[in-house]
């Protein structure tokens, strides 16, 4: 934000600078600067101690010339001020004339526009009234035709609706039939799904039973020695053969049952036959499972008896030895068979060995699995009971299906009778509809003829509408042109108002600058008067000093000793210009030594006093030269600031005056300004920066409230200015809201136009 302000100030200073690069007009000149303008050769005057009266007169002439130049410069400044006042008066007169002419033009244009607008409004109102009457008559005719056509269309629609209602009723009956059939099919599909689920459950349970049987066999095999394992394997093979025989027998019975069920399926539906077959399978499997369970129980009893016999005396041991011999013979036979089997079934043996290892590892868990298997058997018995109940439910569902089939057949017969009746009614409706269609076709022909007539009338009306639209568009074009002209007039008015505001601001700034220049001229006139008074007093003192010097010289000539006269004259000659310079600078200066010496005699104390005064005067001259340099630097700075503020380029006369006065000050070097000069420049810059920031921040969007707060603290804004900035920021940041009215921040124009706050 501050970088943008700095750039803007730099651009304004660059525009305000003069292309020739000359110095600027000072705002005010102090007494010391004007007094020191003629003292540029003070160093030469102070250093040249042996100058004569001719040098003194030449210096006085120089001073007179400098005073004349200053008077000429003051007259030039006065002429410039007069010229500026004349320019100001001319600008004010031109601005008033321009405003009067613009207001007259605007009033004339406004009156002509209002008159033309009233005429156009009257013509348009008459034309629209006529057209409204014509269109109202045409619309009445069209409404009558429309009513007649709508009545005919309503009759046709009613007939078509009756036909469509009958068709919808037939479609609804067919839909009800299809819905009932689909319901039956859906019920059958549900039953099939239930049966499939039951089959899956039975398969899973049979697998579990097989697993339990295998686990029991493996646990028995692992509990005995290798010989007992071989015997158990043989027994297991025999049991497997028996199971295979049982399975083949059950398969044959199942096939017989399947044949019977297929015969039943021909009588009933396919789903009911499958259900009965599944029930028979379940019963057969349950019987087989009961047989297997009884066989396993017999094996367990046999094994327990064998264990009891083993626990008895030596007779049992002999019997066991016999059995051992028989078992050894059997082992040899089985070994031969095993050798033959190993050659043919190596892969099966490898798998069995791996399984034996796994079973050895699972010996510890076998007992737990036995207890679990007993629990599983109990669960299976409960499941068998559940299956029996499901079988009963299936029988009930079969009975329900039969009842539903009978109900469906009865419903189908009733629906067929309804369909026949509906077909008869449909035939009658078709005959009636054909007759109605003939009538409708005749009516349609009449309607087409009337429609053609309506179309012809509509085309005629459309042509008239096009003509009216063309006329309306032409009038709209005229009104748009008038509106554009009004907008241009309004824009010109706004531009004139802006120009007027700018001119008023420029005039006010010029008035301020003129006031400042008047003050500077008054100060310069006062300084000139003081200089004239000082000049006259200096001339009087010079005459007095000359008389005193002549008296001193006559006194010195009367003395006898020439050496003493020479020694006394030298310091007096060196002190003459110093006394003269002191008299020129101080109008109230008087020589106390000349007054204090009676009879014109000069002593050693007078010489010492004159030397001290000489040193004081030299120091005062040095200080005055420094002050002159500072004042010249201040004049240059004031000229620059004045041109920055007013943006006024000096005339050619100022160039000539400065070219004349330029070589008179060749040895003036810039020096550091006083604290008062810095404060004045800072005040000017402060006011200017405040004006720029106010204008910038009120015309464009600011970034945040804290920036306004910071700037208001730095620049010492008043509470009204800070509130105005906050209100403008809130208005620009909000969607809705009224524009804030500025209070004293923007000056009104001469004609008091309404300035939009942006």
From Swiss-Prot:
Membrane topology annotation: Peripheral membrane protein
> Which Pfam families does this chain map to?
GRIP (PF01465)
Q: Provide the GRIP domain boundaries.
A: 679-728
Q: How is it modified after translation?
A: MARylated by PARP12; MARylation is required for basolateral export of E-Cadherin.
Compartment list: Golgi apparatus membrane; Golgi apparatus, trans-Golgi network membrane; Cytoplasmic vesicle, Secretory vesicle, Acrosome
Q: Which UniProt keywords apply?
A: ADP-ribosylation, Coiled coil, Cytoplasmic vesicle, Golgi apparatus, Membrane, Phosphoprotein
Recorded coiled-coil stretches: 50-648
Major localization class? Golgi
| Region entry Disordered, spans | 13-58, 739-758
Among InterPro entries, the record links this protein to: Golgi-autophagy_related (IPR051952), GRIP_dom (IPR000237)
Could you confirm whether the keyword Membrane appears in this record? Answer: yes
Which residues carry the post-translational modification Phosphoserine, per the record? 30, 36, 41, 47, 50-51
- Presence of the UniProt keyword Cell cycle in the record: no
Gene3D superfamilies to which the protein is assigned, alphabetical: GRIP domain (1.10.220.60)
Which is one Gene Ontology cellular component term of this protein? acrosomal vesicle
Q: Please give the start and end residues of each transmembrane region.
A: none
Domain remarks in the Swiss-Prot or TrEMBL record: Extended rod-like protein with coiled-coil domains.
PANTHER family in the record? GOLGIN SUBFAMILY A MEMBER 1, GRIP AND COILED-COIL DOMAIN-CONTAINING PROTEIN 1
Quaternary arrangement and interactors, per the entry?
Interacts with RAB6A. Directly interacts with TBC1D23. Interacts with FAM91A1; this interaction may be mediated by TBC1D23. Interacts with ARL1; this interaction recruits Golgin-97/GOLGA1 onto the Golgi apparatus.
Q: What does this protein do?
A: Involved in vesicular trafficking at the Golgi apparatus level. Involved in endosome-to-Golgi trafficking. Mechanistically, captures transport vesicles arriving from endosomes via the protein TBC1D23. Recognized vesicles are then tethered to the trans-Golgi before subsequent SNARE engagement and vesicle fusion. Selectively regulates E-cadherin transport from the trans-Golgi network in tubulovesicular carriers.
Protein name in the entry: Golgin subfamily A member 1
- Species source reads Mus musculus (Mouse)
Q: Give the gene symbol.
A: Golga1
